[in-house]
């Protein structure tokens, strides 16, 4: 599984071309994962996630609310 990790506010975690920052954010939540800064979305994106990992989803987005 893969997807955008969420901060405590339910929003995607922002980044500006900093893959190492995103890798640390992903691994803090899911130890075996990897991550990078998705350039077009300016958000961290995680890979190698467990199937039950909770990631940002546009249909259940609670960011800012």
Curated annotation (Swiss-Prot):
Biological function: Beta toxins bind voltage-independently at site-4 of sodium channels (Nav) and shift the voltage of activation toward more negative potentials thereby affecting sodium channel activation and promoting spontaneous and repetitive firing.
Domain comment in the entry: Has the structural arrangement of an alpha-helix connected to antiparallel beta-sheets by disulfide bonds (CS-alpha/beta).
Tissue: Expressed by the venom gland.
Protein name: Putative beta-neurotoxin RjAa2
Organism: Rhopalurus junceus (Caribbean blue scorpion)
TM regions (residue ranges): none
InterPro entries: LCN-type_CS_alpha_beta_dom, Scorpion_toxin-like, Scorpion_toxin-like_sf, Scorpion_toxinL, Scorpion_toxinL/defensin
Record's keyword annotation contains Lipid metabolism: no
Intracellular or extracellular location(s): Secreted
A cellular component annotation (GO) from this entry: extracellular region
SMART domains, alphabetized: Knot1 (SM00505)
Keywords: Disulfide bond, Ion channel impairing toxin, Neurotoxin, Secreted, Toxin, Voltage-gated sodium channel impairing toxin
UniProt keyword annotation of Disulfide bond present: yes
Disulfide-linked positions: 11-63, 15-37, 22-44, 26-46
Protein family: Belongs to the long (4 C-C) scorpion toxin superfamily. Sodium channel inhibitor family. Beta subfamily.
GO annotation (BP), single: defense response
